[in-house]
């Protein structure tokens, strides 16, 4: 399968926006991406590290700690409210501008 034309930021944003609570764990984000794009089913470890790196590096993603009493691994990730419209008209191919918190 061919590599999708989307940046990692776009892939992460797609995953978060489709989730019911608009937040996902790293594993939830990776599950969405590999489920939607066959290209990412093969090279799992390498691109998962890129997803992790992009979550930590970009201000448009916000880490949300797990609530006490909710077992599981890892924090949740969501979009900073000010960055919700960073993709023009829902097109994930182009970002409007860099987002800074």
UniProtKB/Swiss-Prot annotation:
DNA-binding span(s): 2-93
InterPro entries hit by this protein: Fork_head_dom, FOX_domain-containing, TF_fork_head_CS_1, TF_fork_head_CS_2, WH-like_DNA-bd_sf, WH_DNA-bd_sf
Compartment list: Nucleus
Keyword Cell inner membrane in record: no
One Pfam family named in its UniProt record: Forkhead
GO terms for cellular component: nucleus
Molecular function GO terms recorded: DNA-binding transcription factor activity; sequence-specific DNA binding
Major location (coarse): nucleus
UniProt xrefs under Gene3D superfamilies: Winged helix-like DNA-binding domain superfamily/Winged helix DNA-binding domain (1.10.10.10)
Xref: PROSITE patterns: FORK_HEAD_1 (PS00657), FORK_HEAD_2 (PS00658), FORK_HEAD_3 (PS50039)
UniProt-listed CDD domains: FH_FOXD4-like (cd20048)
Keywords carried by this UniProt record: DNA-binding, Nucleus, Transcription, Transcription regulation
PANTHER family: FORKHEAD BOX PROTEIN, FORKHEAD BOX PROTEIN D4-LIKE 1
Name by which UniProt lists this protein: Forkhead box protein D4
Species in which this protein is naturally found: Rattus norvegicus (Rat)
